[in-house]
Amino acid sequence: MQLSSTKPSSKTREPSTAQDIVTMQNILEKLYRAESISRQESQALFGAIIRGELEASQLAAALISMKVRGEHPDEIAGAATALLADAQPFPRPDYLFADIVGTGGDGTNSINISTASAFVAASCGLKIAKHGNRSVSSRSGSSDLLSAFGIKLDMSAQDSRQALDDLGVCFLFAPQYHLGFRHAMPVRQQLKTRTVFNVLGPLVNPARPPLALIGVYSPELVRPIAETLKVLGYQRAAVVHGGGMDEVAIHAPTQVAELNNGEIETYELTHRDFGLDTYSLSALQGGTPEENRDILASLLQGKGERAHAAAVAANVALLLRLFGQENLRQNAQQALEVIHSGQAYQRVIALSARG
């Protein structure tokens, strides 16, 4: 489906033709009857949403109807496809690269594990194009933290690609690439509940990575999001939830759904699988962006808390597996060695210097 390239106006606009109106009404009626809609119908619906073509009441009803019934992977994939089609362009690399990202919304207020993991993974030789936004549940989201480090959030797509080439890591700020999200924001704020938009962020990286490690805020989402990644054509990915966190956990078992060349395997991981000690969730508590900056600066220079290093090592270990390094214990040890060397912090400094 060809999505309009016209910039959305500040006011709600009606679909352009009578046929569009009938089709959209049919889609909405199916949702009101608690029926699933197809990937194509979902793509049409979310295309209309990000162009500002739905009334607030229609948008609210559609989102709540999907939430109460439970979103189907095809519906989530259709929504992601619409958002990616509307995204600002990014020069996609032809080499293997990944995203490591969480939905947020887990309410744990932990340190920025996935952001730290991106820099450590790059220092392990991987290429990471991290998609992120401001905080959802914690006091400091990935964008908040990077700003505290002096890293430029509105770096151009070309400059971000150059950073990915040179440093092995770049950060793509969601609002810079997904302008249509703003049409849904007032309704989302009024609803004050999670909707499909809460899980779309990790699925709409404008760089379109073939690999991804995605954390979700609920164990019930692990398998459906893996199914969605399959529909979207990811080569290899892992969806995780660990003990209330949208990360690989070291304080509790982690539920994993791993996609590998079209096949999905579900399994459980504990700290023992990585050869790591266990630590309590309270040991991973974060704070303000400035406090988290200081915590991660110490960690990435090799001077941080053991619990923080272990948490990052576990996530990097699973990310390394997605690139074909299958031994999680060896991967975790490699990550710890990189953390203790201070190499990862040099990448933070180098990325900040490009601002």
From Swiss-Prot:
<keyword id="KW-0028">Amino-acid biosynthesis</keyword>
<feature type="binding site">
    <location>
        <position position="114"/>
    </location>
    <ligand>
        <name>Mg(2+) 1</name>
    </ligand>
</feature>
<comment type="subunit">
    <text>Homodimer.</text>
</comment>
<keyword id="KW-0328">Glycosyltransferase</keyword>
<feature type="binding site">
    <location>
        <position position="102"/>
    </location>
    <ligand>
        <name>5-phospho-alpha-D-ribose 1-diphosphate</name>
    </ligand>
</feature>
<feature type="binding site">
    <location>
        <position position="247"/>
    </location>
    <ligand>
        <name>Mg(2+) 1</name>
    </ligand>
</feature>
<keyword id="KW-0057">Aromatic amino acid biosynthesis</keyword>
<dbReference type="InterPro" id="IPR005940">
    <property type="entry name" value="Anthranilate_Pribosyl_Tfrase"/>
</dbReference>
<dbReference type="GO" id="GO:0005829">
    <property type="term" value="C:cytosol"/>
</dbReference>
<dbReference type="GO" id="GO:0000162">
    <property type="term" value="P:L-tryptophan biosynthetic process"/>
</dbReference>
<feature type="binding site">
    <location>
        <begin position="112"/>
        <end position="115"/>
    </location>
    <ligand>
        <name>5-phospho-alpha-D-ribose 1-diphosphate</name>
    </ligand>
</feature>
<feature type="binding site">
    <location>
        <position position="133"/>
    </location>
    <ligand>
        <name>anthranilate 1</name>
    </ligand>
</feature>
<keyword id="KW-0460">Magnesium</keyword>
<dbReference type="InterPro" id="IPR000312">
    <property type="entry name" value="Glycosyl_Trfase_fam3"/>
</dbReference>
<comment type="pathway">
    <text>Amino-acid biosynthesis; L-tryptophan biosynthesis; L-tryptophan from chorismate: step 2/5.</text>
</comment>
<feature type="binding site">
    <location>
        <begin position="105"/>
        <end position="106"/>
    </location>
    <ligand>
        <name>5-phospho-alpha-D-ribose 1-diphosphate</name>
    </ligand>
</feature>
<dbReference type="Pfam" id="PF02885">
    <property type="entry name" value="Glycos_trans_3N"/>
</dbReference>
<keyword id="KW-0479">Metal-binding</keyword>
<feature type="binding site">
    <location>
        <position position="142"/>
    </location>
    <ligand>
        <name>5-phospho-alpha-D-ribose 1-diphosphate</name>
    </ligand>
</feature>
<dbReference type="InterPro" id="IPR035902">
    <property type="entry name" value="Nuc_phospho_transferase"/>
</dbReference>
<feature type="binding site">
    <location>
        <position position="247"/>
    </location>
    <ligand>
        <name>Mg(2+) 2</name>
    </ligand>
</feature>
<keyword id="KW-0822">Tryptophan biosynthesis</keyword>
<dbReference type="InterPro" id="IPR017459">
    <property type="entry name" value="Glycosyl_Trfase_fam3_N_dom"/>
</dbReference>
<feature type="binding site">
    <location>
        <position position="246"/>
    </location>
    <ligand>
        <name>Mg(2+) 2</name>
    </ligand>
</feature>
<comment type="similarity">
    <text>Belongs to the anthranilate phosphoribosyltransferase family.</text>
</comment>
<dbReference type="InterPro" id="IPR036320">
    <property type="entry name" value="Glycosyl_Trfase_fam3_N_dom_sf"/>
</dbReference>
<feature type="binding site">
    <location>
        <begin position="130"/>
        <end position="138"/>
    </location>
    <ligand>
        <name>5-phospho-alpha-D-ribose 1-diphosphate</name>
    </ligand>
</feature>
<dbReference type="GO" id="GO:0000287">
    <property type="term" value="F:magnesium ion binding"/>
</dbReference>
<protein>
    <recommendedName>
        <fullName>Anthranilate phosphoribosyltransferase</fullName>
        <ecNumber>2.4.2.18</ecNumber>
    </recommendedName>
</protein>
<keyword id="KW-0808">Transferase</keyword>
<dbReference type="GO" id="GO:0004048">
    <property type="term" value="F:anthranilate phosphoribosyltransferase activity"/>
</dbReference>
<feature type="binding site">
    <location>
        <position position="102"/>
    </location>
    <ligand>
        <name>anthranilate 1</name>
    </ligand>
</feature>
<feature type="binding site">
    <location>
        <position position="110"/>
    </location>
    <ligand>
        <name>5-phospho-alpha-D-ribose 1-diphosphate</name>
    </ligand>
</feature>
<feature type="binding site">
    <location>
        <position position="188"/>
    </location>
    <ligand>
        <name>anthranilate 2</name>
    </ligand>
</feature>
<dbReference type="Pfam" id="PF00591">
    <property type="entry name" value="Glycos_transf_3"/>
</dbReference>
<comment type="function">
    <text>Catalyzes the transfer of the phosphoribosyl group of 5-phosphorylribose-1-pyrophosphate (PRPP) to anthranilate to yield N-(5'-phosphoribosyl)-anthranilate (PRA).</text>
</comment>
